[in-house]
Amino acid sequence: MINKLYIRTFGCQMNEYDSNKMVDILKHSHDLTLTDDATSADVLLLNTCSIREKAQDKLFHQLGRWSKLKNKNPNLIIGVGGCVASQEGELILKRTPYVDIIFGPQTLHRLPNMLNDALNNKKTSIDISFPEIEKFDHLPKPRTNSVTAFVSIMEGCSKYCTFCIVPYTRGEEISRPFNDVINEVKILASQGVREINLLGQNVNAYQGSMNDGEVSDLALLINIVAKISGIKRIRYTTSHPNQFSDSLIEAYAEVPELVSHLHLPVQSGSDKILRLMKRGYMSIEYKSKIRKLRKIRPDISISSDFIIGFPGENEKDFLDTMILIDEIGFDKSFSFIYSVRPGTPAASYPDDIDIQVKKQRLALIQKTINNNTEHISQLMIGSIQKVLVENITKKGNELFGRTENMRNTHFKGDKSLIGQIVNVKITKGRGNSLMGDLLTQI
């Protein structure tokens, strides 16, 4: 008899979304209840990410810890999913024969059958295939108690940037049908969700088939989602600059529910490095798109991703990146030292930059953007911000929510305001956090 499920998730928002779906699937099929205590669970699932270096090390370290639990309880079921499972399924089977289930991002809907096989046949069940996007046809209706929710609208990526493993672990771009996405949003809205975050590895490549034979792009999808009763905010992530289209920019003029925050990964400010990365644009094109957007939304917050120390990056290339950061004024960033992903084209490039130089460059970028974050937060003091109330604080004496530009905001108020957008006058700001006084409900 199995009762409790524990999931450990590494990586991106897509993995968080997938993990939530695993919970729904196994609740529906086996009535498993999620627990935050691995030692009390009957089923342990590890949802992995292969974007960063040492993903394998992280995986096998965690499995080593779980093997001790399995030694104490031979009936414990251990499963590995996600991108590392997709990439290294056979290696996982070889190195950790005590693992019962191995599945990829596109086969998580088959978990109930795989779990039954593991329970009944006592042998490892493995499925890391790429069956189009059929998993969405087999998922139970979403369930949530939150006022915010992710909705996956497409999977995979067809850009094949030289540094990126995603096309090899999640496959090429496949879009969910338009009506499937709309129906999921409607269900979530009926459960009290007020903010929807549309997800995809390359979300603005969305091309969802419609009943009339037409195809919806992301801009049209956003326009329709905004009309769904109860939806007050819309976000989307992650975007590629190449497909940040004029129609998508125009959506910021047409759809007030589309928040004034955009995450648009640039990776580098150097045209030479962008060519080596096979990004498909130059820095001037990136800046042009941001200028167009800011004509419509002058106050929009821009965040980005940066890869530091990509092979061939010299001082001039790094300076070009710093110049871009200064010109755009990024609010936040996810910045990492380049790490080789086996199987990608860039894995064959010579790693010709000293690690200390990479660390110094990373530190400078992070310091610069952290200063930007602090400066913007300080400028918000005295302003009135629209905050979506998400919950009460752990101490229970305040409410918290987020501004459109992703600032965590704390203020005193009644818990009946959860799920509402309220006006808050900002009184303090530090880093990514704000404090304020409640004014009125919108």
From Swiss-Prot:
Q: Which residues form the signal peptide?
A: none
Subcellular localization, per the record?
A: Cytoplasm
* Record domain MTTase N-terminal: where: 3-120
The record's free-text note on cofactor binding: Binds 2 [4Fe-4S] clusters. One cluster is coordinated with 3 cysteines and an exchangeable S-adenosyl-L-methionine.
Task: Identify the InterPro entries for this entry.
Answer: Elp3/MiaA/NifB-like_rSAM, Methylthiotransferase, Methylthiotransferase_CS, Methylthiotransferase_N, Methylthiotransferase_N_sf, MiaB_methiolase, rSAM, rSAM_horseshoe
What keywords does the record list, in alphabetical order?
4Fe-4S, Cytoplasm, Iron, Iron-sulfur, Metal-binding, S-adenosyl-L-methionine, Transferase, tRNA processing
Select a single GO molecular function from the record's annotations and give it: 4 iron, 4 sulfur cluster binding
Detail which positions bind [4Fe-4S] cluster 2.
157, 161, 164
E.C. number: 2.8.4.3
Give every Radical SAM core domain span. 143-375
The reactions it catalyses are: N(6)-dimethylallyladenosine(37) in tRNA + (sulfur carrier)-SH + AH2 + 2 S-adenosyl-L-methionine = 2-methylsulfanyl-N(6)-dimethylallyladenosine(37) in tRNA + (sulfur carrier)-H + 5'-deoxyadenosine + L-methionine + A + S-adenosyl-L-homocysteine + 2 H(+)
Locate the TRAM domain: which residues? Answer: 378-440
Q: Record's Gene Ontology CC terms?
A: cytosol
Q: Which cofactor does it need?
A: [4Fe-4S] cluster
| Keyword match tRNA processing | yes
Q: Give residues annotated as binding [4Fe-4S] cluster 1.
A: 12, 49, 83
Q: Which Pfam families match?
A: Radical_SAM, TRAM, UPF0004
Q: Does the keyword NAD apply?
A: no
Quaternary state and partners of this protein? Monomer.
Main function: Catalyzes the methylthiolation of N6-(dimethylallyl)adenosine (i(6)A), leading to the formation of 2-methylthio-N6-(dimethylallyl)adenosine (ms(2)i(6)A) at position 37 in tRNAs that read codons beginning with uridine.
Family statement drawn from the similarity comment of this UniProt entry: Belongs to the methylthiotransferase family. MiaB subfamily.
Q: What is this protein called?
A: tRNA-2-methylthio-N(6)-dimethylallyladenosine synthase
Annotated organism of origin = Vesicomyosocius okutanii subsp. Calyptogena okutanii (strain HA)
Taxonomic lineage is: Bacteria, Pseudomonadati, Pseudomonadota, Gammaproteobacteria, Candidatus Pseudothioglobaceae
Corresponding gene? miaB
